[in-house]
Amino acid sequence: MSSCGACTCGAAAARLLTTSLTSAQRGISCGRIHVPVLGRLGTTLDAQALRRAPLRTFSETPAYFASKDGANKDGSGDGNKKSVTEGSSKKSGSGNSGKGGNQLRCPKCGDLCTHVETFVSSTRFVKCEKCHHFFVVLSEADSKKSIIKEPESAAEAVKLAFQQKPPPPPKKIYNYLDKYVVGQSFAKKVLSVAVYNHYKRIYNNIPANLRQQAEAEKQTSLTPRELEIRRREDEYRFTKLLQIAGISPHGNALGASMQQQVNQQMPQEKRGGEVLDSSQDDIKLEKSNILLLGPTGSGKTLLAQTLAKCLDVPFAICDCTTLTQAGYVGEDIESVIAKLLQDANYNVEKAQQGIVFLDEVDKIGSVPGIHQLRDVGGEGVQQGLLKLLEGTIVNVPEKNSRKLRGETVQVDTTNVLFVASGAFNGLDRIISRRKNEKYLGFGTPSNLGKGRRAAAAADLANRSGESNTHQDIEEKDRLLRHVEARDLIEFGMIPEFVGRLPVVVPLHSLDEKTLVQILTEPRNAVIPQYQALFSMDKCELNVTEDALKAIARLALERKTGARGLRSIMEKLLLEPMFEVPNSDIVCVEVDKEVVEGKKEPGYIRAPSKESSEEEYDSGVEEDGWPRQADAANS
């Protein structure tokens, strides 16, 4: 051992060294020297002195201690975390025996601890005279700096939230969607039930690990001494203790050992013969992904946007038109989960319980043709989404990190619910061909499917011809209600992709009555939006009932659904929105003839200042005649 001339810790180190064991892993460092507290003893110690020395161990952990090799010298296997507890007084004395106002108790035996005399004004070393253990005391100020509140796991958070505030029932979600979306009652019921079951699946699947851990702890056999140690540990614990891995001021060596102990305490999954011998097993609820299909402007995206506002889980809306296969220019498939992680504020545990809405999924349908060697934006994207829909671990780039650095976060999509939607233009023609197939000789069908583009072209050609709009809508809705998986496969979706979307929900087209309701009834309706625009210029907008029906008929003829309403309103109100600002117009009236283009919108103007002054003067003169008559009579 090297000597220290002016250092005050030399005597303390020498005293500790004389009462040590024959091996240890650490030492006391001070200034210019490093004195091993429990080092391998050579010939420097007398053998008789070593036999007379009591059995002691030393721990440098601020809030825990760990015996050497994780076990006591009596073989009781006490490698758990311990703390030095304080008595009634908060202020710790320096160099006192601990019998006054400051009382530090040993976490192993509960006996009083005494401070080690080191000729220093303040010491953090205490020892227990009964079990001969040394400890490092962490002050209250240091504990506030070092002890950080450990975030509870996502499973505990979900379980606690489920107990305190149960998930909204499907009827409540349905009523909320009804305030913003008109019609589509079947689709709203399916989404409401799917969201509610998603909450229940999270509550059922994730806390199962906690229950298994509790059962494993109960089955662990403990000796009476270990039970006594645990009882005293709970009795004298004075603060919440922190997992020491990675934050110990003395390094990560002790933290690594603690992490290994935690990993050993985690319940292990049953393997091999244990699965065969087990008599019962927990039911794991699997997810049912949803596919929404319907004409454009029927409310598919609006349903998703409205649903995202009322959920307590992360919700991400992703556009499939920009996705490409890995290695090509465009967005990677992992960007779908990256958006979900961003919505969860980069909380991985929370993102693994979210909902992903895949919009425009029909645009990734494969296009048949021998001229195309590789469909990177169609079938390649579907193949990349297969494991994502079923459940896999996705490597998502970290926040503020480039892709080339390789800094990724692993996200498990097993409990992520996927809702896909698409217009699927021409799908009704494919269903019609399937239902009206005519067979030639040897069972060969006369009308073979030609894929997505041929079906869409046939549907567009049918729209261009003159036909009854109401009959076309009814026929299309009737056919979509009979959609099957083989129709989607003929459209261009691969069978593996269709099989991972078991719930298929067709949305019906919007009729005239529904379009009139969309104009006025929802909270974010079209007519109230334009009325708010005119009210900013201190002007009113009045639209008659006949005008609303005429606007709905125009939208039906355009066959663009509810999106056609806004374009019609923009065209009708272009001139009024140009004339009203900085004018005397106080009201704009729109009737049926204005919608049909037979006349211009009507304006109601405020009276000018000169006319109002003349009317006021004439009114004063008229009021003056009775006064003069009364004065004359009096």
UniProtKB/Swiss-Prot annotation:
Residue sites binding ATP per the record: P295, T296, G297, S298, G299, K300, T301, L302
Binding of Zn(2+), residues: C106, C109, C128, C131
EC number: 3.6.4.10
Chain segments annotated as coiled-coil in the UniProt record: none
Organism domain of life: Eukaryota
Residues annotated as domain ClpX-type ZB: 94-147
Location(s), subcellular: Mitochondrion; Mitochondrion matrix, Mitochondrion nucleoid
Biased composition (Low complexity): 85-94
Name recorded for this polypeptide: ATP-dependent clpX-like chaperone, mitochondrial
Protein species of origin: Mus musculus (Mouse)
Lineage: Eukaryota, Metazoa, Chordata, Craniata, Vertebrata
Encoding gene per record: Clpx
